[in-house]
A protein has these predicted regions:
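Substrate-binding pocket helix/loop in short-chain dehydrogenase/reductase
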Residues: 77-78, 85-90
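C-terminal helical subdomain
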Residues: 156, 160-161, 173-205
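Conserved NAD(P)H cofactor-binding loop of Rossmann-fold oxidoreductase domains
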Residues: 69-75
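Residue(s) in the substrate-gating loop at a strand-loop-helix junction
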Residues: 120
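Rossmann-fold cofactor-recognition segment
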Residues: 36-48
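Active-site helix of classical SDR
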Residues: 101, 136
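N-terminal Rossmann NAD(P)H-binding glycine-rich loop of SDR-like oxidoreductase domains
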Residues: 11, 19
Length: 205
């Protein structure tokens, strides 16, 4: 059967670049996002979207890879956020990651498979005007580190990726020194085929 990857946030930015590269290397790919161009359209932080994505992927072959790349960034000084903004950032950057991992991690430990959770350098250090985003990414990092621990001695592999700023629609304005998402995608996909066990990737601009 074909090897299938699920890529959340797979219709723009880094997620799209990863999905395209995986297809070039022979994998079937199911993209998940709110955009109509996704293979599965919906909110990745909702269980029904997870279920539809997994069912669609299973119809194509064996799910062997999950890339959690869905994310939202809303920025401002601490104390300036409204509840709707907080929930949107936490849902996209943390809840979606947890729900997709919780669905696929058990089968990966049994049958084999890889989870790649796209974090951010905001998961590694405090950044001014990014309090809620940092909170979500630090949470995703903590969850991912626990998955790595629970994966030991099983057939599952878990990789965390913390890239710096990239030229993607995530940012309203590109900044000097931002990186090419296609270059970052190559680093990530190459790590999947590496002869050594890669569990953490930090890519700084």
């Amino acid at each position: 059967m074909a090897s299938v990857a699920i890529v959340t946030g797979g219709t723009s930015g880094l997620g799209e670049a990863i999905a395209e590269l995986l297809r070039e290397r022979g994998m079937q790919v199911v993209t998940v996002s709110r955009r109509d161009s996704a293979d599965v359209t919906g909110n990745a932080a909702h269980e029904d979207t997870v279920a539809r994505a997994v069912a669609h992927a299973e119809s194509l072959g064996d799910i062997t890879l999950l890339v959690n790349c869905a994310g939202v960034g809303l920025f401002g000084a601490a104390g300036s956020y409204v509840e709707e903004d907080v929930r949107q950032v936490i849902d996209a950057n943390l809840i979606a990651t947890i729900l997709f991992c919780d669905e696929l991690f058990p089968r990966f430990t049994r049958d084999g498979g890889t989870i790649v959770n796209i974090l951010s350098t905001a998961a590694l250090q405090a950044k001014v005007n990014e309090s809620v985003y940092c909170a979500a990414k630090w949470g995703a990092r903590g969850y991912t580190e626990v998955l790595k621990t629970e994966a030991k001695g099983t057939k599952a592999r878990v990789i965390s990726v913390a890239p710096g700023g990239m030229h993607t629609p995530f940012w309203e304005q590109a900044r000097e020194g931002f990186m090419d998402p296609k270059a970052i995608a190559r680093v990530i996909v190459d790590a999947l085929d590496a002869a050594v066990n890669v569990s953490s990737i930090v890519i700084e601009r």
